[in-house]
Amino acid sequence: MMTTLRRRLPDIVQYSVLSLAAFLSIFPFIWMVIGTTNTTSQIIRGKVTFGTALFDNIASFFAQVDVPLVFWNSVKIALVGTALTLLVSSLAGYGFEMFRSKLRERVYTVILLTLMVPFAALMIPLFMLMGQAGLLNTHIAIMLPMIASAFIIFYFRQASKAFPTELRDAAKVDGLKEWQIFFYIYVPVMRSTYAAAFVIVFMLNWNNYLWPLIVLQSNDTKTITLVVSSLASAYSPEYGTVMIGTILATLPTLLVFFAMQRQFVQGMLGSVK
């Protein structure tokens, strides 16, 4: 029996640590769900059991927020921005891997170096550019800085190394143009890579807070993230209402991740199917 226990001890320790880590990760979400059913005073007192104020908190949130509008703003920015980022960045990654040029590696290195520049250093120049272009207080101004993402370009170039070059060569022999090879062959073959990139970029766009806070000024252009933040920073915040908004803001990213979890893992592992 002692021998069996010694053999299983590493597994017991491993699963205990993983269980603790999982609990610590999910506890804030559980506490947030419980908080939606309690009043502000109960939450401040630290109540960790379910209450009876759920419908009051929901009614309060919908009374203060134009939920369809802010959700539409968030969905539009997230989906359109993600689609544009995947298109531009995958084209760039494909080009850097497939085409030979003396300047290729130099340009690629410059793009990667931009990853070392903090976004805070770019905010003022970007804000001035958007102002000169007349794009302040528009959703286009939120999407543009993300379209050519250095990380996603790097990700697609690395994934493109696993793309079978025989397919490209055979397509060229059959007379296909480069854009046809990209859209009709490369994209379907690399769908797991696209799925993983979609999850990453969608979450970044959906949770984007600082840049929209600076650019979006009118209430009819704001996203769910900004609205929930404004409720939380009010002079006398209603925490139950804030938690309702936080859950509503969190659900889309969770749904996207769980719906595409298998493809996400395949894409991150470099799977090409």
From Swiss-Prot:
Q: InterPro entries in the record, alphabetically? A: MetI-like (IPR000515), MetI-like_sf (IPR035906)
Give a yes or no for keyword Membrane in this entry: yes
Membrane topology is:
Multi-pass membrane protein
Keyword set includes Protein transport: no
Q: Which UniProt keywords apply?
A: Cell inner membrane, Cell membrane, Membrane, Sugar transport, Transmembrane, Transmembrane helix, Transport
Subcellular localization: Cell inner membrane
Q: Which CDD domains match?
A: TM_PBP2
A Pfam family reported for this protein in Swiss-Prot or TrEMBL: BPD_transp_1
Taxonomy, superkingdom: Bacteria
The Gene Ontology biological process annotation of the record reads: transmembrane transport
Q: What induces it?
A: By lactose and various galactosides, and subject to catabolite repression by glucose, galactose and succinate. In strain AR50 the expression of the lac operon is constitutive.
Specify the ABC transmembrane type-1 domain's residue ranges: 71-260
**Where does the chain cross the membrane?**
15-35, 77-97, 110-130, 134-154, 182-204, 240-260
Q: Name one GO cellular component term.
A: plasma membrane
User: What is this protein for, i.e. what is its function?
Assistant: Part of the binding-protein-dependent transport system for lactose. Probably responsible for the translocation of the substrate across the membrane.
Which PANTHER family does the protein's record reference? ABC TRANSPORTER PERMEASE PROTEIN MG189-RELATED-RELATED, ARABINOOLIGOSACCHARIDES TRANSPORT SYSTEM PERMEASE PROTEIN ARAQ
Family, as annotated: Belongs to the binding-protein-dependent transport system permease family. MalFG subfamily.
Protein name, as recorded: Lactose transport system permease protein LacG
